[in-house]
């Protein structure tokens, strides 16, 4: 009861988050044109990460910003969003700052803004205490972009340094509550493109009842320079992006083209 009263008294506009950066005209992280907020902090160490500068939750690597401040910046671009665009929060791993997410999306929804969460879901916990906050977040979230790095747990540890148990649990939970989801898988030659694993991932996604879109994201090297700047060895040096044939193979094995519900949704922002 006391906790509920405290939550009710919070001025969401003054809630702060560690923001790494923003992008004004995102065109690939959700429907339409979107304002992207990249939050600081991530516990994964994906070998192909293009934002390794977002890993550490250190003040000197980010800006401490209020919800009102972020929204004020976002609203400058609202005229470009049309009826499909809105705000996407990514990272780093956005769920590490779930209180900021709840505050930002709550205020955004009051303004009629479409809210998308881009997450790998590693922080997810299927416990009553965590779900209380997660459900509160989902109540003001229109769409989740869920990154599934690898279906094979041992290979997932190699790719990210972490297990995928919480990620798959989150996928199932989102299915249970009927939250619209786009599944995303980064295709890295020799790392995340093994046929057997792709088939298993396709089977897993088929068990979910809420998948509007299933995206294959071909590996690219645009973030490699950041690893060099940070003095971190880049394990994928020399690895080329997947060929068109390998991308086509992955799409066919996982039947990604069968997920078309995203084309039927129109969002009013």
Residue spans of the language-model regions?
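Auxiliary Fe-S-binding modules of radical SAM enzymes
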Residues: 1-28, 182, 187-269
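Solvent-exposed alpha-helices and their adjacent loops that cap or buttress functional pockets
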Residues: 12, 28-30, 81, 137
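Canonical Radical SAM [4Fe-4S] cluster-binding loop centered on the CxxxCxxC motif
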Residues: 14-15, 21-65
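Short glycine-enriched, charge-decorated loop/helix-capping segments at active-site entrances
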Residues: 53-61, 157-163, 231-240
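Extended, non-globular alpha-helical segments
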Residues: 59-77
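Conserved AdoMet/S-adenosylmethionine-binding subsite of the radical SAM
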Residues: 71-79, 83-86, 91, 95-222, ...
């Amino acid at each position: 009861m006391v906790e509920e009263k405290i939550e009710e008294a919070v001025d969401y506009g003054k809630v702060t988050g560690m923001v790494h950066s923003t992008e004004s005209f995102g065109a690939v992280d959700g429907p339409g044109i979107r304002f992207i907020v990249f939050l600081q902090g991530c516990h994964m160490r994906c070998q192909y990460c293009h934002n390794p500068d977002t890993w550490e939750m250190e003040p000197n690597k980010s800006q401490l910003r209020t919800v009102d401040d972020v929204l004020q910046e976002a609203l400058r671009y609202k005229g470009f969003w049309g009826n499909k665009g809105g705000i996407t929060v990514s990272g780093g791993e956005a769920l590490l700052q779930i209180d900021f997410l709840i505050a930002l999306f709550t205020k955004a929804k009051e303004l009629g803004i479409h809210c998308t969460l881009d997450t790998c879901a590693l922080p997810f916990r299927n416990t009553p205490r965590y779900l209380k906050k997660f459900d509160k977040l989902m109540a003001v979230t229109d769409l989740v972009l869920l990154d599934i790095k690898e279906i094979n747990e041992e290979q997932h540890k190699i790719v990210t340094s972490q297990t995928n148990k919480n990620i798959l649990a989150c996928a199932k939970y989102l299915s249970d509550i009927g939250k619209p989801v786009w599944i995303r898988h980064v295709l890295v030659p020799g790392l995340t493109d093994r046929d057997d694993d792709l088939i298993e991932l396709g089977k897993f996604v088929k068990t979910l009842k809420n998948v509007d879109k299933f995206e294959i994201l071909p590996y690219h090297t645009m973030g490699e320079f950041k690893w060099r700047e940070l003095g971190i060895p880049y394990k994928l040096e020399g690895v080329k992006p997947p060929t068109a044939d390998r991308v086509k193979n992955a799409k066919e094995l996982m039947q990604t083209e069968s997920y078309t519900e995203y084309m039927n949704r129109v969002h009013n922002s």
